[in-house]
From Swiss-Prot:
Pathway participation: Protein modification; protein lipoylation via endogenous pathway; protein N(6)-(lipoyl)lysine from octanoyl-[acyl-carrier-protein]: step 2/2
Compartments, as annotated in UniProt: Cytoplasm
GO molecular function: 4 iron, 4 sulfur cluster binding; lipoate synthase activity; metal ion binding
Residues annotated for [4Fe-4S] cluster 1 binding in this entry: C55, C60, C66, S292
Keywords: 4Fe-4S, Cytoplasm, Iron, Iron-sulfur, Metal-binding, S-adenosyl-L-methionine, Transferase
Reaction(s) the record says it catalyses: [[Fe-S] cluster scaffold protein carrying a second [4Fe-4S](2+) cluster] + N(6)-octanoyl-L-lysyl-[protein] + 2 oxidized [2Fe-2S]-[ferredoxin] + 2 S-adenosyl-L-methionine + 4 H(+) = [[Fe-S] cluster scaffold protein] + N(6)-[(R)-dihydrolipoyl]-L-lysyl-[protein] + 4 Fe(3+) + 2 hydrogen sulfide + 2 5'-deoxyadenosine + 2 L-methionine + 2 reduced [2Fe-2S]-[ferredoxin]
Cofactor: [4Fe-4S] cluster
Residues in Radical SAM core domain copies: 67-281
NCBIfam families hit by this protein: lipA (TIGR00510), PRK05481.1 (NF004019), PRK12928.1 (NF009544)
Residues reported in the UniProt entry to bind [4Fe-4S] cluster 2: C81, C85, C88
CDD domains: Radical_SAM
One family name in Pfam for this protein: LIAS_N
Gene transcribed to yield this protein: lipA
Protein name per the record: Lipoyl synthase
């Protein structure tokens, strides 16, 4: 029996994935470690206070830029997800009991770090009666209570499309409500078997109808075609998505989906122009862009478009 480091048995899909060696990255997949004064101060603070961010723990290549802008991302709900997506490094399994003190700790971390903008994401919690809706909403509420001048972006699962659970989350009023579609319809079930493409679009539409600024992400290099990406961009815009990020898939381990191709930077430039032409209020596309990359600046850009005649929702 083959097991993963977390101790569970490998899925057949993971065994098949592992037969393909980790791909060699092209020369354009690289970053420069530019450590400015804000980054250096924040890193020291995180060390002293024992704070935890997705930025560090996931080894995000954009940490230097985001921390220099006093932006950071936090993961809530535990280390085990009840769903498995073939690109995601978070492990699948039975999550620990709900930690009802987590919203306070995240809010205090945001406060201690002096963040201008915070992104909160989390695992799917299908084991909980409310799917984790209270946890997501309460984290936003607590951050806003302690940090009234800090923007909050909330990246959520689909809560199985449950209207009551979605409404509870929406009512916490994050500056941005994000739900990532990630890939195109043809390969969606293979990549995200516990999600549905149409349901993900419906979540974005519901958030937009509630009056929130909406956001999604597409990952390239998992077997899609450029024409399919263009179609997905049209679907997202038609669904009411305000902000879109587009990125290159980087394989976390041999048991994850192989990289089908490395998308050249020129293609990201073309897709960015295409998305802007569709009317997205904020667009970022590139090999090392991540869904939370420059999130505060993207929100400000989108808010100027969405709320041209009124102040942004806060």
């Amino acid at each position: 029996m083959t097991v993963v480091p977390e101790g569970r048995k490998l899925l057949r899909l993971e065994v098949r994935n592992a037969q393909t060696p980790i791909e060699r990255k092209p020369p354009w997949i690289k970053t420069r470690a530019k450590m400015g004064p804000e980054y250096t101060e924040l890193k020291g603070l995180v060390r002293r206070e024992g704070l935890h961010t997705v930025c560090e723990e996931a080894g995000c290549p954009n940490i230097f830029e985001c921390w220099e802008d006093r932006e950071a991302t936090f993961l809530i709900g535990g280390e085990q997800c009840t769903r498995r997506c073939d690109f995601c490094q978070i492990d699948t399994g039975k999550p620990a009991d709900l930690d009802r003190d987590e919203p306070r700790r995240v809010a205090e971390s945001v406060q201690a770090m002096g963040l201008r903008y915070s992104t909160v994401t989390g695992v799917a919690r299908d084991d909980l009666p409310d799917g984790g809706a209270w946890l997501y909403a309460e984290t936003v509420r607590y951050i806003k209570r302690l940090n009234p001048n800090t923007g909050v972006e909330l990246l959520i699962p689909d809560f199985n499309g449950n209207p009551e659970q979605l409404e509870e989350v929406f009512e916490s009023r994050p500056e941005v409500l994000a739900h990532n579609v990630e890939t195109v319809p043809r390969i969606f079930k293979r990549i995200r078997p516990a999600f549905r493409y149409d349901r993900s679009l419906a979540v974005i539409t519901a958030a937009r109808n509630f009056g929130l600024v909406t956001k999604s992400n597409l990952i390239l290099g998992m077997g899609e075609t450029i024409d399919e990406v263009r179609t997905a961009l049209r679907d997202l815009h038609d669904a009411g998505c305000d902000i879109i990020t587009i990125t290159q898939y980087l394989r976390p381990s041999p048991r994850h989906h192989p990289v089908e191709r490395w998308v050249h930077p020129d293609e990201f430039v073309e897709l960015s122009a295409y998305a802007e032409g569709l009317g997205f209020a904020g667009v970022l596309a590139g090999p090392l862009v991540r869904s939370s990359y420059r999130a505060g600046k993207l929100y400000a850009q989108a808010a100027r478009v969405r709320f041209a005649d009124q102040p942004p929702v806060s």
